[in-house]
Amino acid sequence: MARAEGDSWDVASSVGATAAMVAAGRAVATRDPRGLIDDPYAAPLVRAVGIEFFTKVADGEFDITELDPSSAAEMQARIDEMALRTRFFDDYFLASTAGGIRQVVILASGLDSRAYRLPWPDGTVVYEIDQPAVIDFKTSILAGIGAEPTAERRTVAIDLREDWPAALRVAGFDSAAPTAWCAEGLLIYLPPEAQDLLFDNVTALSAAGSTVATEYVPGILNFDAEKARAASAQMRERGLDLDMPSLVYHGERKHVMEYLTSLGWTMAGLPRTDLFAKHGVPMVAHDNDPLGEIVYVSGTYQNR
């Protein structure tokens, strides 16, 4: 079903289900002996969501490369990318806090468990923003397995299409303190104008020295829905009915690096191929990837 203005979801439906997909990828990467990431909470969260396909992937009962044996190497590269994407944002947060930042905001936090698994410095406050059903689910499941945050975790249960800056302030956010902002895997699910508004708000809330990290997805401009549906069909044959093309907003939008630069941020980009090379992971060309050559971007706010 296509997206609609004001649509909502939980962790097992629509955009919410993509959080389980990403968490399943983190669970697979956590078992990988290369040790690119360590997310002990990914698999328990996926199991709790209850989508059988993702549970089997997370628990190692189904090898995702078997979806299409003719392109097993490409499928492995997709799993590797999930691990490396996670590692990119992990490293970003660790670098930001090493530089003295003690206020963190994770936009559309989904099943992200960084507030529980990263070694945050004393005094760090991590704000998680997402829809109420998603926040409540994750909080309940992690409490149920005895997980405890490694920073002061403050949840902001609100849709990003609503007045989240006001809700963030109510939760105790200090706009006078530098902040590490993260918008991981989010932008393709926002209309172009909402993407701009998101970063307008982030900038308005940022003190000098704040940092930001997100992705630039060039393929969303000329999004190939047929390629995406072909990939969805492979999963549907395994019992997963998730129509990814209907969840994303494609078409022309502003280049996120250029837009943030225009707002006073000093930005840098790391193309996907360079991210793989940085960690010594072989890169297989994604000939059928409808999202194109993703660039991971980060930067620092210079002026207010």
Swiss-Prot record:
Keyword Transferase, does the record have it? yes
| Methyltransferase as UniProt keyword | yes
Write the Enzyme Commission number(s) for this entry: 2.1.1.-
Give the residues annotated as coiled coil: none
State where S-adenosyl-L-methionine binds. 130, 159-160
- Highest taxon of source: Bacteria
Any single GO molecular-function term of the entry would be: methyltransferase activity
BP GO annotations = methylation
The UniProt keywords, alphabetically, are: Methyltransferase, S-adenosyl-L-methionine, Transferase
Q: Which family does it belong to?
A: Belongs to the UPF0677 family.
Per its UniProt record, what NCBIfam families does this chain match?
A: mthyl_TIGR00027
Q: Tell me, what does this protein do in biology?
A: Exhibits S-adenosyl-L-methionine-dependent methyltransferase activity.
Name it: Putative S-adenosyl-L-methionine-dependent methyltransferase Mkms_1059
What species is this protein from? Mycobacterium sp. (strain KMS)
